[in-house]
Amino acid sequence: MLQPKRTKFRKAFKGRIHGAAKGGFELNFGEFGLKAMEPERITARQIEAARRAMTRHMKRAGRVWIRIFPDVPVSKKPTEVRMGKGKGAPEFWAARVAPGRIMFELDGVPADLAREALRLAAAKLPIKTRFIQRIEE
């Protein structure tokens, strides 16, 4: 699973995702993409599950780019622990995703195969998404 090799701080504030994506909202690598339509934290496990769903459906053909990276440590206190006594230990890593952000890109496969692969990937994610395709001119 994805996670940073090292970080400046062990724990992070919860934070909020305001407004639309300020970058990463255009296709840069592939012909097809999966765009987020809602703000949400996507965990490293969800990213990995989506990646596996895509690559298995495409039968290892084509190329996949993951455009988001889980760089935010999410901490959690153990169950049945009283309030207070400090913040919990880091439990997992997440990526903050704003609406409009391209999360995955595909290339080297037909459009119908790419659409189905990204539909399967979207089923693993907790947000509404949209399939996008590069416009030929």
Curated annotation (Swiss-Prot):
Pfam families, per the entry: Ribosomal_L16
Keyword Secreted: no
GO molecular function: rRNA binding; structural constituent of ribosome; tRNA binding
Keywords of this entry: Ribonucleoprotein, Ribosomal protein, RNA-binding, rRNA-binding, tRNA-binding
CDD domains linked to this entry: Ribosomal_L16_L10e
One GO-annotated biological process of the protein: translation
Gene3D superfamilies the UniProt entry points to: Ribosomal protein L10e/L16
InterPro entries in alphabetical order: Ribosomal_uL16, Ribosomal_uL16_bact-type, Ribosomal_uL16_CS, Ribosomal_uL16_dom, Ribosomal_uL16_sf
Entries under PROSITE patterns matching the protein: RIBOSOMAL_L16_1 (PS00586), RIBOSOMAL_L16_2 (PS00701)
Gene Ontology annotations for the cellular component aspect, listed alphabetically: cytosolic large ribosomal subunit
NCBIfam families recorded: rplP_bact
Family that this chain belongs to: Belongs to the universal ribosomal protein uL16 family.
Primary role: Binds 23S rRNA and is also seen to make contacts with the A and possibly P site tRNAs.
Quaternary structure annotation from Swiss-Prot or TrEMBL: Part of the 50S ribosomal subunit.
Protein name: Large ribosomal subunit protein uL16
Organism: Beijerinckia indica subsp. indica (strain ATCC 9039 / DSM 1715 / NCIMB 8712)
Highest classification ranks of the organism: Bacteria, Pseudomonadati, Pseudomonadota, Alphaproteobacteria, Hyphomicrobiales
